[in-house]
Each structure stands twice: as structure tokens, then as C-alpha cells.
């Protein structure tokens, strides 16, 4: 708003995540990469990602698995030769936690604000290959090791076991940022500032 010369106070808090006991564990890693969600995602990048890993698109609840935007983008899969992408229907919370603890996530975002998948990956220490948008950097930090700038770089990072372990450990250091306690304290601070 500053660049528009609008003098309006704005408060900021990070989206919190309720704790999750199931964390990514490299010893259980199944060499699979998953795509989660559909809003402002570039599905084509996921389908074009060159990897030996099993690729899985989590379709989510019925209401968005049948959304025209989602369906149009899922049809992009057929344009790519030898695409080993599998589709999973909506998962229970238990099964979602399980797949997150044994996989790496890949997203190519057109834009984002407070992205649930980013927060869920921090909470579970699940490495997420993601393009470094400003709003993503607010959550993952500028030194996050699993940012990519091209699909070739993403594919290369996906094959680096040490980097995957390092990324999971790095995400542990970001968990305080999304804690419920921090959210409540920050929200209280923001409300005090505007009252």
C-alpha cells in the first residue's frame, strides 16, 4: 500500500499449523514426489519434471477434484510422453500424514499468499521443492535449500539425498514461526496496535 501512497495500518501474522506428530523421516522415504492443491499451481511443470521418482497428484476433496480449473490442468498430463503420474483420491488425515512423511512435495506456484501446503510442509518437516516467491520466502526464509529456478535444477535437487535430509532439518528450525502460540501472541500484538 505504501507504493500507492495509501496510509493505512496493516497487521501481519503468519498462518499457524496445529502440531503434527508424524514427521518426514528419510529412512522411510519412498522416492516419490507429490503435488498438492490446485489454486495458482502450474501443473504442467509437475508433469514435465524429469525424475525416476513416482509422481503423485493428490486430488483433494470432491469439490475441487471436479473444479473446471483442476480438470483442465489434469488433462495436461496426456501431452507428456512416458509420464508416470498417478492420481490419489482424497486422503484421510492419517493417510495424508503418512504420505507427507514419506514423500517430497513439488509446487510451481504462479502466486501465493499464505499457502497451506507450505505451512503443512514446515509442520511435518517435509521437503518441498518450490519456486521462491516473496510470500513463500516469508515462510521458508531466504536460505531455504530446496528453492529451484528451473525444472532441471528441481530434478537435480530431487536426486540429492544429502540435500533432502538438510532441507528436512532446516524445516524443523522454521516450526516456531507457525506455532499456534506465536500466532496468538502476534495477533494480540496486532490487535493492541490498532485499538
Annotate each PLM feature.
Residues 142-152, 157-162:
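Conserved acidic donor-binding segment of nucleotide-sugar-dependent glycosyltransferases
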Residues 1-23:
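Donor nucleotide-sugar binding/catalytic pocket of nucleotide-sugar-dependent glycosyltransferases
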Residues 98-113, 126:
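Acidic donor-binding loop of glycosyltransferase active sites
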Residues 21, 27-93:
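Conserved catalytic-core segment of nucleotide-activated headgroup transferases in glycan assembly
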Residues 111, 126, 130-140:
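Short glycine-rich donor-binding/catalytic loop of glycosyltransferases
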Residues 90-103, 121:
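Short alpha-helical donor nucleotide-sugar binding micro-motif in glycosyltransferases
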Residues 97, 115-123, 134-137:
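Short alpha-helical segment that forms part of, or immediately flanks, the ligand-binding pocket
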Residues 152, 162-195:
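A charged, aromatic-enriched C-terminal amphipathic alpha-helix characteristic of glycosyltransferases
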Amino acid at each position: 500500500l505504501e507504493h500507492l501512497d495509501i496510509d493505512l495500518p496493516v497487521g501481519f501474522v503468519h498462518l499457524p499449523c496445529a502440531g503434527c506428530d508424524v514427521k518426514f523421516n528419510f529412512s522411510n522415504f519412498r522416492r516419490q514426489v507429490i503435488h498438492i492443491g490446485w489454486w495458482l499451481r502450474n501443473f504442467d511443470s509437475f508433469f514435465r519434471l524429469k525424475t525416476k521418482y513416482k509422481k503423485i497428484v493428490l486430488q483433494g476433496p470432491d469439490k475441487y477434484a471436479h473444479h473446471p480449473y483442476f480438470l483442465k490442468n489434469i488433462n495436461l498430463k496426456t501431452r507428456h510422453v512416458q509420464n508416470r503420474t498417478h492420481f490419489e483420491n482424497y486422503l484421510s488425515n492419517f493417510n495424508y500424514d503418512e504420505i507427507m512423511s514419506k514423500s517430497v512435495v513439488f509446487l510451481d506456484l504462479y502466486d501465493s499468499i499464505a499457502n497451506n501446503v507450505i505451512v503443512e510442509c514446515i509442520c511435518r518437516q517435509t521437503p518441498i521443492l518450490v519456486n521462491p516467491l516473496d510470500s513463500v520466502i516469508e515462510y521458508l526464509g531466504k536460505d531455504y535449500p530446496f528453492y529451484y529456478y528451473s525444472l532441471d535444477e528441481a530434478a537435480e535437487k530431487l536426486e540429492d539425498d544429502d540435500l533432502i535430509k538438510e532441507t528436512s532439518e532446516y524445516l524443523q528450525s522454521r516450526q516456531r514461526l507457525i506455532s499456534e502460540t506465536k500466532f496468538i501472541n502476534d495477533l494480540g500484538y496486532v490487535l493492541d496496535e490498532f485499538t
